[in-house]
Regions:
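Sec/Tat signal peptide C-region and signal peptidase I cleavage site
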Residues: 15-19
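A short, structured loop/turn motif at beta-sheet edges
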Residues: 20, 42-46, 73-74, 108, ...
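Positively charged n-region of N-terminal signal peptides that target proteins for export
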Residues: 1-5
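N-terminal edge beta-strand
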Residues: 21-47, 58
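Extracellular/periplasmic metallocenter environments
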Residues: 53, 58-60, 101-147
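Short Gly/aromatic-enriched secondary-structure transition segments
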Residues: 62-70
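Extracytoplasmic/periplasmic copper-protein system
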Residues: 20-29, 70-92, 134-147
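Short beta-strand and strand-turn-strand segments in soluble, beta-rich domains
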Residues: 33, 87-101
Length: 147
């Protein structure tokens, strides 16, 4: 019993020391909502992967979703540039240094993954994520907590 208890304690300690949250899962729906309002990004991870699943059924041209990450101070400036004429391939956004990360746009039933180099984020700054499909950002956005 003593050996079992020792091994149990060791495994718990090892899990808390070595565990890191380097993979985030988000779902978007046909109701123009993410299933989370905040995500936590761990800077101890060199890379973090965000997996976005579109849990709805509507096609990409009617209800596409993606994940865009910007500094909170730039949210208004970036969202004002969203335009259908820029196309789904670009997430309806022009190229901009203010866009730190952007995933591919997906339609109902599809999933996209965004690999992020965590060195591009600064713990002293505030970040947000949002969907850049025209009109979605007003409801589909959230805060990013960096630890």
């Amino acid at each position: 019993m003593k050996i079992f208890f020792t091994m149990l304690c060791a495994s718990i300690l090892a899990t808390s020391v070595f565990a890191s949250n380097c993979e985030i899962k988000i779902e978007g729906s046909d109701m123009m909502k993410y299933d989370v309002a905040e995500i936590t990004l761990d800077t101890s991870c060199e890379q973090t992967k965000i997996s976005l699943k579109h849990a709805g059924k509507l096609p990409i041209n009617a209800m596409g979703h993606n994940v865009v990450i910007v500094e909170e101070k730039n949210l208004s400036k970036i969202t004002q540039q969203i335009n259908f004429s820029l196309g789904v391939e670009k997430g309806y956004l022009p190229e901009s240094e203010d866009i730190i990360f952007i995933s591919a746009m997906v339609g109902g039933g599809d999933t996209t993954e965004l690999e992020m180099d965590m060195s591009k984020l600064d713990k002293t700054k505030s970040y947000v994520f949002f969907c850049s499909f025209p009109g979605h950002w007003a409801l589909m956005r959230g805060k990013i907590k960096i630890i």
